[in-house]
Amino acid sequence: MTGGEGSFMLRFVLPTENDRDAVLSFYNEVEKSGGECIGFRYRNDYDRWLSDMRNRHAGKDLPQGYVREDFYICYDGADVVGVFSLKFELTDYLLNYGGHVGYAVRPSRRCEGIATRILAEGMNIARRSGFERLLCICDDDNYASEKVIIKNGGVLENTLYDPDEKVTVKRYWIGL
């Protein structure tokens, strides 16, 4: 899956063994920037992480509270510039505080429009998977993510306080 705009061409792939170095480079940069990122629970064990991603894709052997999820690595050329996650159902927690989608952009590639493009392509993936609308949620102080969601047609439904994370979130729906 590709799309072009400006000086980058995004390619979405489900992770394989061949993505090891590029994925680890991406997550190392995120960690060095002091940030956290969706999708990388096993920082020191790529094989375990890859097995976890495959199980999520298949919807098998999921930890309690987890749902079937497709997790994509987003490339620009040979470099991982971001990640995208699509969850296929909403638990009560996801309905209130998590949503259907998650995405992140490599710190050195932020402010290039990549997040907007990742979400737009993610919407295409969701549409082809039978979704009619997506729930996108961001922390109320994450103005960059809020801007991305709104650019992609997000309509604010409400804000909720997440007592587990001790943060207020904004809940947006995007019609597909």
Residue ranges, per PLM feature:
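Conserved acetyl-CoA-binding loop-helix of GNAT-fold acetyltransferases
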Residues: 102-105, 111-124, 147-151
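Conserved catalytic-core motifs of GNAT/GCN5-like acyltransferases
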Residues: 137-138, 153-171
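Conserved beta-strand-loop-alpha-helix junction that forms the acyl-donor binding cleft
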Residues: 110, 136-146
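Short coil/turn motifs at secondary-structure junctions
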Residues: 89-91, 108, 141
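Structural motif
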Residues: 129, 151-152
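Conserved G/P- and acidic residue-centered "switch" motifs that form tight phosphate/ATP-binding loops
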Residues: 113, 130, 142
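Conserved GNAT acetyl-CoA-binding A-motif
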Residues: 126-137
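GNAT-family acyltransferases
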Residues: 2-100, 125, 169-176
